[in-house]
């Protein structure tokens, strides 16, 4: 295919990374084409109202949080916010547990009231010493001991990654807090909120503010590169795909989602479980660490959105193996996978006039705010390199 038009920047991927870079470059006067193989923008943060009238996150829950005022200020140009205290529970041994691990969890474990000092003493006896944990198993048993590790972490991690925690980097489970007080909030960042009209609406306003962006949906990388002559390429997809899997496919985990909606009597019957009318479960997210349960978690995002609707939708999340042609969600956080990526990183470094940003392009897990920060920094670098565009 011969190129039939030209642009200044060709950006592959219409998620956070691609759209933020495009907005900043367009603001500097450059023409940008953003292409995405999916039929919608927003990447994995895409949300929409389903048939039950419930706003749902189509690719798993996206809990926005950050400690960066700069990132909040930037995104606030395109959205208002609904502040959220994200709550999670775990379901094991036939009951709901407070999670992350805290004093309430300990009381549930021993079946009687306890004080912080009681829990601290118990932890001191239960912990297994690992001064410098080498993997996720060592991280958790050094924090909470073997019993809580097996109850909440081992089975969940095995399902999520199809690898034992001792095969995974220490960072995987090191992200989960453990507290000896009653604080059961999942996250610790100073700003925790959702876009008040959803992520898709936020991205829509970003595009409305940027007439220099030409969004092409349903267009894959090969077609976009063949169709548009460009000065510089920004690639946010999988780095091994960019190189045609020349060195073999990198390992990823994929996901499958099953949504189910409830209303009327079916929803009313759940009040005894959820604790409040209009909801199916007692928290926004419930983890299922039992290895015999095929899904890892059930998410009811209505807890966080605050949407007033006489229905609710739950989404069960099933980890899945990934093969080329499928949807890669998570790079594998393990030494062998990281070593395989380094060979692709060397190829990427040698590419001229190409930027690789985002989770898949750099084969590393990032939160949304980190992706935004990366995109802002790359846009600044590109404007410094190329100067201002001509509009």
Language model: regions and residue ranges:
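Glycine-rich, N-terminal phosphate-binding loop of Rossmann-like dinucleotide-binding domains
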Residues: 14, 237-238
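Dinucleotide-binding Rossmann-like beta1-alpha1 core, especially the glycine-rich loop
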Residues: 52-126
């Amino acid at each position: 295919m011969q190129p039939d038009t030209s642009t200044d920047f060709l950006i592959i991927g219409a998620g956070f990374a691609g759209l933020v870079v495009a907005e900043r470059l367009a603001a500097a006067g450059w023409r940008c084409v953003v292409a995405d193989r999916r039929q919608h923008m927003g990447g994995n943060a895409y949300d929409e109202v389903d048939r039950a009238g419930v706003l749902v996150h189509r690719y798993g829950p996206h809990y926005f949080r950050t400690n960066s005022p700069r990132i909040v200020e930037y995104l606030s140009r395109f959205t208002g916010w609904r502040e959220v205290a994200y709550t999670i529970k775990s379901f094991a041994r036939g009951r709901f547990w407070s999670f992350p691990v805290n004093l309430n969890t300990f009381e549930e474990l021993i079946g009687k009231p306890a004080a912080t000092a009681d829990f601290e003493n118990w932890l001191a006896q239960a912990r297994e010493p690992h001064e410098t944990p080498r993997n996720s198993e060592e991280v958790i048993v050094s924090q909470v001991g073997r019993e809580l590790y097996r109850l909440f972490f081992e089975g969940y991690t095995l399902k999520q990654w199809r690898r034992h925690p001792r095969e995974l980097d220490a960072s995987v489970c090191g992200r989960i807090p453990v507290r000896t007080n009653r604080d059961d909030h999942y996250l610790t960042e100073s700003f925790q909120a959702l876009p008040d009209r959803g992520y898709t609406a936020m991205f829509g306003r970003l595009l409305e503010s940027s007439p220099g962006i030409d969004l092409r949906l349903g267009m894959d990388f090969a077609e976009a590169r063949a169709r548009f002559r460009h000065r510089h390429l920004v690639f946010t997809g999988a780095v091994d795909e960019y190189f045609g899997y020349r060195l073999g496919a990198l390992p990823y985990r994929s996901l499958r989602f099953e949504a189910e909606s409830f209303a009327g009597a079916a929803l009313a019957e759940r009040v005894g479980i959820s604790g409040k009318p209009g909801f199916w479960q007692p928290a926004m997210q419930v983890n299922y660490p039992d290895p015999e349960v095929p899904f890892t978690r059930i998410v009811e995002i209505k807890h966080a959105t605050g949407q007033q609707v006489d229905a609710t939708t739950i989404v069960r999340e099933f980890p899945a193996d990934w093969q080329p042609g499928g949807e890669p969600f998570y790079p594998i956080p393990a030494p062998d996978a990281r070593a395989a990526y380094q060979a692709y990183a060397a190829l990427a470094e040698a590419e001229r006039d190409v930027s690789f940003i985002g989770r898949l392009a750099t084969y590393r897990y990032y939160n949304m705010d980190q992706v935004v920060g990366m995109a802002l920094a790359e846009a600044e670098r590109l404007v410094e390199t190329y100067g201002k565009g001509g509009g």
